[in-house]
């Protein structure tokens, strides 16, 4: 099979109904919109308007707070780092944030990169990142490597 031979399954995309094309079509004249009124005209309804009743979004109390300067980290799991090391896309000798971005493992750094412990990790690697979970640090040291966190390095 070639790309130009690909076809939708029969009935996968039903024929579009052409509205307002005469009485014989079954969807002529009003085109299924009924008679007059706001809904028959273009623009349809006003979202969130409940006919004068206090709308839901006003009935419920305001709650919570969004921190305007909250740090957003790019998250990477150890299992994925291991895959990239096995594939030869990452050098286990020294893994930095820049090398993670260059390898395509992380799209962009954001406010830093945080390593989490999901997945198997067996490589003896030296990793330097902005943040890491305790279990990730343990997993790397158990494999014989070292995971340094930028905040700890700055404190020393």
Swiss-Prot record:
GO function terms (MF aspect): rRNA binding; structural constituent of ribosome
Chain's role: Binds to the 23S rRNA.
Subunit: Part of the 50S ribosomal subunit.
Name of the coding gene: rplO
GO biological process, one term: translation
One GO term describing the cellular component: large ribosomal subunit
HAMAP family in alphabetical order: Ribosomal_uL15
Keywords recorded for this protein, A-Z: Ribonucleoprotein, Ribosomal protein, RNA-binding, rRNA-binding
Segments for region (Disordered): 1-44
Name this polypeptide is given: Large ribosomal subunit protein uL15
Compositionally skewed regions (Gly residues) per UniProt: 21-35
